[in-house]
């Protein structure tokens, strides 16, 4: 049993709290929804509850598959106990199908099947709009090392294969998603969350979107999409 102490950090969708165990934190999932680097904001009732449950199920699955993550256990509807990591200030964006900003940037039709999975790297800085960078930028600015980045890409590739297969069984296409990583006792761990906030999930039969694009694009029924992802994961 751990006890929650002071808040260490508040992000767009989560709060991080210290605990009486120095190497553990409590991650609290909020109902806040944001898009376009915080320009669009709303409260969506139960979003935090659903994202906590979805992320917990996915991290439990990844842990069983040998992927080392920061996740320890789900504590309640909104809270997880996680290892306290030093976040690598990078996001790895994994694209299996062209959609969103990549489709727009490269003039591709949304839904275009990429010839190979594409990894993109962005520098985590809201004031700069999380700009896309390459490996040399990442190492050059001191965000990581080539050795660490190779490890991150190795984990990313494994996670992509595991998740694609898992969601395929639930008739969901994993279009793209973003991952974050942290350092813990000299190791690289998968961190943050994996949820409809951070992934594009399309129904494999109808193409219906079941993710944050429903909020970004004012499609309505945002929470129904999240709930559908959770219901299928539970099967």
Swiss-Prot record:
Q: Which InterPro entries match?
A: SAICAR_synt/ADE2_N, SAICAR_synt_PurC, SAICAR_synth, SAICAR_synthetase, SAICAR_synthetase_CS
Q: In which pathway does it act?
A: Purine metabolism; IMP biosynthesis via de novo pathway; 5-amino-1-(5-phospho-D-ribosyl)imidazole-4-carboxamide from 5-amino-1-(5-phospho-D-ribosyl)imidazole-4-carboxylate: step 1/2
Q: Does the keyword field hold Ligase? A: yes
Reaction catalysed by this chain? 5-amino-1-(5-phospho-D-ribosyl)imidazole-4-carboxylate + L-aspartate + ATP = (2S)-2-[5-amino-1-(5-phospho-beta-D-ribosyl)imidazole-4-carboxamido]succinate + ADP + phosphate + 2 H(+)
Keywords attached to this Swiss-Prot or TrEMBL record, sorted alphabetically, are: ATP-binding, Ligase, Nucleotide-binding, Purine biosynthesis
Q: Which GO terms describe its biological process?
A: 'de novo' IMP biosynthetic process; cobalamin biosynthetic process
Q: Please state the Enzyme Commission number of this protein.
A: 6.3.2.6
The domain of life is Bacteria
Record's keyword annotation contains RNA-binding: no
- Molecular function via GO: ATP binding; phosphoribosylaminoimidazolesuccinocarboxamide synthase activity
As for family, the record states:
Belongs to the SAICAR synthetase family.
- Read off the HAMAP family from this record: SAICAR_synth (MF_00137)
* Name of the protein in question: Phosphoribosylaminoimidazole-succinocarboxamide synthase
